[in-house]
């Protein structure tokens, strides 16, 4: 145990799926430690993650990071970790129906993130990107032309239906943090696609900018705790995976 109220176990050199959890913890001002980023002599490094995956944190075996420990509770899977933390850190409404709605939307983000990953690893996670480049080009073509407009258009309609400025209308929640991360990641990975789509997802873009300027998030983004995007994480920028600029399909209304 590190003495922190929350211990996050995730790969120390990438944002990845763990970044959704980091953003929530940062926004809440939570007492947490990113365990694998500690020195090895303090229990950090990749070995910390391997200990978690061996079940040394509790009675249940996680499949993969991120893993969160809060006292005697150990939770894995990004969406479930957020579902667990949201009520504890006052980042989700008390209404159980709204909590389910937020969880549903977060699971939709999980689907999107999986599709982002498959643009650079469409065949096998065990192969290098260079071994599946041709297939990645085909996968990314369909993703940028069809799937990005579909997902982001859906979230645009969610915000519009709620009346904005947040996904739940006037109520800020951890879902808004996750939407920010999605927009940031897609802007990094597929900048031309996002630029051409921007006029049709104005509410989502405004939400992302509002999250960026929240005091704790702004401080986090300016700190070394916020790892940069790179070609090891979920959102990767390979210029060859983005076709020359053209208008994506119209956002469904």
Identify the residue ranges that each predicted region occupies.
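Long hydrophobic alpha-helical segments typical of transmembrane helices together
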Residues: 203-253
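Short, contiguous strand/loop micro-motifs
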Residues: 7-9, 194-195, 219
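Generic, ordered loop/turn and secondary-structure boundary motif
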Residues: 21, 76, 92-93, 113, ...
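GST-like fold's C-terminal all-alpha helical module
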Residues: 97, 104-213, 253
């Amino acid at each position: 145990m590190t003495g922190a109220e929350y211990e996050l176990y995730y790969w120390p050199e990438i944002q990845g799926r763990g970044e959704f959890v980091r953003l929530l913890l940062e926004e809440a001002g939570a007492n947490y430690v990113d365990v694998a980023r500690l020195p090895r002599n303090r229990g950090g490094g990749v070995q910390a993650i391997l200990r978690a995956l061996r079940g040394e944190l509790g009675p249940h075996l996680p499949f993969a990071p991120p893993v969160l420990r809060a006292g005697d509770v150990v939770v894995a899977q990004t969406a479930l970790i957020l579902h667990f933390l949201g009520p504890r850190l006052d980042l989700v409404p008390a209404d159980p129906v709204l909590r389910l709605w937020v969880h549903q939307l977060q699971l939709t983000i999980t689907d999107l993130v999986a599709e982002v990953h498959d643009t650079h690893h469409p065949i096998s996670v065990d192969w290098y990107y260079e071994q599946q480049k041709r297939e990645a080009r085909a996968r990314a073509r369909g993703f940028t032309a069809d799937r990005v407009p579909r997902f982001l258009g859906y979230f645009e309609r969610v915000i519009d239906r709620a009346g904005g400025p947040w996904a739940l209308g006037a109520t800020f929640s951890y879902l808004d943090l996750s939407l920010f991360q999605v927009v940031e990641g897609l802007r990094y990975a597929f900048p031309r696609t996002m630029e051409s789509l921007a006029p049709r997802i104005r509410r989502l873009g405004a939400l992302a900018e509002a999250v960026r300027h929240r005091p704790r998030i702004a401080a986090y983004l300016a700190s070394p705790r916020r790892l940069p995007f790179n070609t090891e994480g979920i959102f990767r920028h390979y210029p060859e995976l983005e076709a020359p600029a053209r208008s994506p399909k119209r956002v469904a209304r």
